[in-house]
Structure formats: structure tokens, C-alpha cells
Amino acid sequence: MNKQNMTKSKISQTIGDSYQKYPKELERFIWVLDKLKQTIGMGSDIDIRTYPMKVAYKLTTMFTTLWNIIIHDKDFCCANIIIRSIADNISSLNLIYQQTIEEEIKILRHNLYFLDDIDTRLGNIQYPIKNENISEEEFGKLLNQQHLFVKNLMEAKNVLLNNITHLKLYTTHKQQIEKLIKKGHYNWKFISLDIEPSKINNKNNVYTWKKMYSLLELKGQEYFFSSYQSSYVHGLSLSNITIMPNKENLGILLSIALALMVRLELYIRNYYQSDFERIINNQK
């Protein structure tokens, strides 16, 4: 067997293994998360202790949906979009909660991460407009719902900002952090705080998504996530090229998703290491 045939045979074996392993690994990972949930509880939506577990639970649903799309719908396009979203989620978790060694840096990133999305939502708020097709009562309810939504977002924003300004890190790096929380920034992807305040948000001090993908250490897949799958996410021209949704092509996507799932479980086990030790000890 020549080298080319050996490589093709190895790829076929990997694809075949993925179809066998994927549902089993997913079922086992859900079991792992269930055990973890029983041990630590769910916490609030912005609790730094339980938030990574919440994200992992959400991703198991996405992994399940991906399996159904590949096996039943054979939708190559949607499969790519879901995998890219999964990669984005895991890359964010990895940067915020694992790559960061210092606890206060981790807390800072966590709060900035939420502030970034909250500020975006607040900036896109649109209040209902009264017209003849809606009653005064219905309009009042819609208006109250929107006001309540804004109120809740503002309360969460104030809590997050308060968390940041009470960090010891805020005392030692006040100017830098003030730049990070300046309206329009909330830069949770900063590389270092030990830099001139005026340069804290410069592109040379910000992790790109491509760099964040590389931190997952999935053997060059950062190019696949950042370039190839971007075509599907954004509906670019090359995403409309016909690719046969056969077992081999879909299997390649499944093997990448399986690698992401394994990476996510490793991350969760590392982040909750002491909790898993308790789980193991309780089973003895």
C-alpha cells in the first residue's frame, strides 16, 4: 500500500470511529455534567463558579442537534454553522476561565465578557410604536415589558461594574481597567494589563478569534474555524458551492466536533477538578 492509500485509509478509519464514538461520548459527557450539577448546583446566570457548567450544558444540546443534522438531515451547511458556534463558545470559555492563571484576571474577564454583550443589547433597544392595530392595553404591556428588560440589564450592568471596581487589581491597574470598561469597549479579550493605558485596546493587545482558536490546540483547526467556516456563518459565495453530503464529508465534520467535545470535557474537568475529586470519593 502506497503512502497516499495509507493516508486515505487512516482518514476513513478516523471517520468511521467518529460515527461510533460521538453518541457514546456525548451521552457520557451529559452524565458527567449531571453529576457535577448535583454537586455544585446551578447558581445565578452570571455566577463565575457555575457559568462554565451552564455553557457546557447548552453545548451538549448543540452537539445533539449537530448529530441529528448530520445523521438525519445530512445538512452540510448547517453542520458547519453549528460547529463554528460551538468552537466560538469553547474558545471563549478557554480564554476567560482556563488560560488565565490569576484569579482576579479571570474575574475581570468574566465581568467584561457579560458587560460586552449587555452593552450591545442596550444599544439596540427599540421601544414599540403605537399604531391603530394595537390597543392601549396591549401597547402598555409591551412598553412595560421593554422597560423591565432595560431595568434588569442596567441592574446587571451595575453589579458587574461594581465587581470590577472592588478588585485589588483595579487599585494597581486603575487606568488600564478604566480604558477596558470605557463605553463601547468592554474588552475581555485583552492580552495584558501591563501596558500603557492608551494602548490597552490596541489590536496588538487583543486576542483575535483566530488566536483564540489556536489556544484550543486542535492541530491547525484555527484556520478551519476562522476562514472555511466563516463562509457558512456569513453566507459568503464559497458556502454555496455544492459539496456532497455523503458519509465521508459529513464524517469529517463529525470528527472535528468530537475533538471539540473532548476538549470541552477536559476543560470542564480541569476547571472543576476539586469537585470531581469529591464525586469520585463519594462513589467509593
Show which residues each predicted segment covers.
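Intrinsically disordered, low-complexity acidic/Ser/Thr-rich segments used as protein-protein interaction/activation
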Residues: 83, 103-114, 120-124, 128
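Secondary-shell segments that build the walls of catalytic and ion/ligand-binding clefts
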Residues: 2-50, 61, 116-284
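Long, hydrophobic/aromatic-enriched structural stretches that serve as scaffold segments
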Residues: 41-100
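Short, glycine/acidic-rich hinge or "gate" loops at secondary-structure transitions
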Residues: 79, 97-109, 276-281
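Amphipathic alpha-helical scaffolding segments
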Residues: 81-88, 103-104, 110, 245-254
